[in-house]
Amino acid sequence: MDLSTILGLVLAVASISLGDILEDGNPLHIIHLSSVIIIVPTSLFAAMTGTHARYVKAAYKEIKIVFLNPKINLNETIKNLVELATLARKDGVLSLEGRVAQIEDDFTRNGLSMIIDGKDLKSVKESLEISIEEMEEYYHGAAHYWETAGETAPTMGLVGAVMGLMLALQKLDNPAEMAAGIAGAFTATVTGIMCSYAIFGPFGHKLKAKSKDIIKEKTVLLEGILGIANGENPRDLENKLLNYIAPGEPKKSQFEG
């Protein structure tokens, strides 16, 4: 569970509510059903219009990444690659054939299968790089959907406010009802801005940020697979791959006690 996502959402709503309460307001008055209906679905539908269908599907499929941390452990990934490099250097690349069948990750399995089959390194590298590029495009397309919804929401809030004002002005003969209608109209603006900057926009930014971690793992795997194919010294390969671990994160070497 990514607590920063949950805390961010909760604290954003709490901050707005607290500010309203300090001015003797009632946060529940901000929740206006008609405003929510005008803004939320319309923003999502508008984003759908401007996003390729496969990325719309990806946006909802991968939204879980915003709330859950991807199962990525670069130290473990590097450890596995170094073990494979050690085995390949000792017994040859063909000795990896039995291990490849046990690997769950398609990217790793495909890469190792290609070098076991004797494909030239240039072809292996190009194939894996294309796979990484497509994966990056996939996640960026999904993030684009949520970012577009975030960009659209404030405008939909203005649409809701204008519609509310139009209805309120029809009640000029009843000042009390007109005032209530005007107040209700402006809740649409608040709802649109909140949806944009506290929900949809952050969803897109978080999805894009986390996709970078996924792409980094695939890049480490690519470098490791090419190192295995080149017969690199396992220690040298490990030193190179450990550089991909972010500063401040622990780096675990198999060759240190």
From Swiss-Prot:
Entries under InterPro entries matching the protein: Flag_MotA_CS, MotA-like, MotA_ExbB_proton_chnl
Location relative to the cell: Cell inner membrane
Any Pfam family: MotA_ExbB
Keywords: Cell inner membrane, Cell membrane, Chemotaxis, Flagellar rotation, Hydrogen ion transport, Ion transport, Membrane, Transmembrane, Transmembrane helix, Transport
Annotated membrane topology: Multi-pass membrane protein
Keyword check for Cell membrane: yes
GO biological process: bacterial-type flagellum-dependent swarming motility; chemotaxis; proton transmembrane transport
Membrane-spanning intervals of the chain: 3-23, 28-48, 149-169, 180-200
Protein's UniProt keywords contain Cell membrane: yes
Cytoplasmic side: 201-257
Chief subcellular location: membrane
Record-stated family: Belongs to the MotA family.
Function: MotA and MotB comprise the stator element of the flagellar motor complex. Required for rotation of the flagellar motor. Probable transmembrane proton channel.
Subunit description: Each stator complex is composed of 4 MotA and 2 MotB subunits. 2 A subunits and 1 B subunit are thought to form a single ion channel, so that each stator complex contains two channels.
Protein name stated in the entry: Motility protein A
Origin species: Helicobacter pylori (strain ATCC 700392 / 26695) (Campylobacter pylori)
